[in-house]
Amino acid sequence: MVSYGSHSSEVSKVLKTPKFVLRYGNVSSKQRFALKRKINYKLRESKYQEYLNEYNTFVLYDWENSGAGSLVDSSYNLPSLWKEFITEGISKGAINDKLPTVFMKRKLTNSALGHCLGLDFLTDPSESEHEYRCMFQTVQDIPSLSQLILFNSMPNVPVRLKLHTIGININFGCKRSLISNGGDQDTEMSEAVSYIQPLLEESSRMYRNLNYWKLLKIARNNKKDEPLDQSTRIKSQVKLLLSQLATNRITSPSVTDHGGHNWLIFTRRRL
């Protein structure tokens, strides 16, 4: 069940009509533009908040050159490449379109999502123009997360999308949280998430300055009070997930507690 998210255009339509000018008096074009921009920003922030309440996972992708072109080249239609990326992911089974999913048509409004989750890398003014593409999904198990992590654009395209951030909802209050009371799959996810977070936190020295090799070490570490049981399917899946994150350089973990939303977030470390 897939939808393509966008904020409501009703307010935008109103702002374009003469009634707006009549209602608010003699305002300049600059003032009208500023107000329109502010309202659109609030609409997007509200929409992101709605999706964070509704879905238990979000994924951010950003663009990288593959040696054949530049992102700033105006000949590339990035919305079309984003749509092709989604189609390719679904056709290859990396994106399960049978799960509740929403793909944001437009590029991410970075600071809006950053304010929703308290993510500094999105609210930093220097990052305001960095282009991310975003999808929200309600995943049901660790293998679904692994599929999302492993899927990137094919290398033969001029500019391609690459995984940058993955967020997992661990908020007990969220109706679609990975920790809920919705059956066997929810129980599996609850066990998986409840294992990932302490595993990172117990490795506190690594947690503060994580990198590729340290995350792999955490994933492989068996010297715990409760050893990682290789025969336990879910724990084995968690080990594989952490290894996949490390392979993709997604080695900056954090836990947000902002506005009632608790998310375990992994972000690609800057080189």
Swiss-Prot record:
GO cellular component: mitochondrion
Biological process per Gene Ontology, one example term: rRNA processing
Main location: mitochondrion
Subcellular location: Mitochondrion
Keywords assigned: Mitochondrion, mRNA processing, Ribosome biogenesis, rRNA processing
Job description of the protein: Involved in 5'-end processing of mitochondrial COB, 15S rRNA, and RPM1 transcript. May also have a role in 3'-end processing of the COB pre-mRNA.
Entry protein name: Cytochrome b termination protein 1
Species per Swiss-Prot/TrEMBL record: Saccharomyces cerevisiae (strain ATCC 204508 / S288c)
